[in-house]
From Swiss-Prot:
This is Phosphonoacetaldehyde hydrolase. It catalyses: phosphonoacetaldehyde + H2O = acetaldehyde + phosphate + H(+). It comes from Bacteroides fragilis (strain ATCC 25285 / DSM 2151 / CCUG 4856 / JCM 11019 / LMG 10263 / NCTC 9343 / Onslow / VPI 2553 / EN-2). The gene is phnX. Belongs to the HAD-like hydrolase superfamily. PhnX family. Homodimer. Gene3D superfamilies: HAD superfamily/HAD-like (3.40.50.1000), Putative phosphatase, domain 2 (1.10.150.240). InterPro entries: HAD-like_hydrolase_sf (IPR050155), HAD-like_sf (IPR036412), HAD_sf (IPR023214), PGP-like_dom2 (IPR023198), Phosphonoacetald_hydro (IPR006323).
Length: 263
């Protein structure tokens, strides 16, 4: 009888850092350091990609590209990308520890699944050096994974599937049908689709919702439901197998997937 053997979790916006805020401020400050203005919506759009690729995507946006040309009288180059990445890393490392609190519900949910024998892997848009900060902080707060793959040591990060493949190899999981990838960005969903695993989006606490926990609780019920529905649609349009409101719904979803695997 086939059943789900492995959950692969994203990090910021899925497991820790409610609303995925750590990278946002660092990107905005980095671009400001080069005299360029980007807003929160632009900053969040490529979220989930490797951070250096995220910078390329921001520079490619027509309004940002135009700003760059107007300011520097030339097209941007890979040297500019590297310079922006250095600035981004400087600002991110200065605040990263503050953004490692596990999202409510994550620890009990994942521990319940682990107790049932599931392996817990993870992928991220953060580099290994960034995860060297995040992993011990999250673990000290009660959240741990069995493996963490980072994009900088592989042929490509998201939306390519290599980080998932590395998890499957390291955790000895041979069948992608028995794997659920959980994430909060469009890049997360695409990563799962490309790896041919069950790709699940989670809405509350996500980059796509772009709200703090306090802002989420303060929203009128009807507006909250509308926002959740919008995010769900975006995730399904990107190819999500399922979308759940919060991580607490994951065990029930796994039961549903298990029943489908055996019909």
């Amino acid at each position: 009888m086939k059943k789900i053997e492995c959950i692969i979790m994203d990090w910021a916006g899925t497991a820790v850092d409610y609303g995925c805020f750590a990278p946002v401020a660092a990107f905005i400050k980095a671009f400001a350091g080069k005299g360029l203005t980007i807003d929160v919506e632009q900053t969040r759009k490529p979220m989930g990609l490797p951070k250096i690729q995220h910078i390329r995507e921001l520079l490619t946006m027509p309004e940002v590209n135009e700003q760059f040309i107007n300011r520097y009288r030339r097209a941007w180059t890979e040297e500019d990308v590297v310079e922006l990445n250095h600035l981004f890393e400087k600002y991110l490392f200065a605040s990263l520890k503050e953004y490692t609190d596990p999202i409510p519900g994550v620890i009990p949910t994942l521990e319940k699944l682990r107790a049932e024998g599931l392996k817990i892997g993870s992928t991220t848009g953060y580099t290994r050096e960034m995860m060297d900060v995040v992993l011990p902080e999250a673990q000290a707060k009660g959240y741990r994974v069995d493996y963490c793959a980072t994009p900088n040591l592989l042929p490509a990060g998201r939306p390519a599937p290599y980080m998932i493949f590395e998890n499957l190899t390291k955790l000895a999981v041979p069948d992608p049908d028995t794997v659920v990838k959980v994430g909060d960005t469009i890049a997360d969903i695409q990563e799962g689709v490309h790896a041919k695993v069950w790709s699940v989006g989670v809405v509350l606490g996500s980059n796509e919702m772009a709200l703090t926990e306090e802002e989420t609780h303060a929203l009128p019920a009807a507006e909250l439901e509308n926002r959740i529905a919008e995010v769900k649609q975006r995730m399904l349009a990107a190819g999500a197998s399922y979308v759940i409101r919060s991580i607490e719904e994951l065990p029930a979803l796994i039961q549903l997937i298990n029943s489908k695997l055996n019909h």
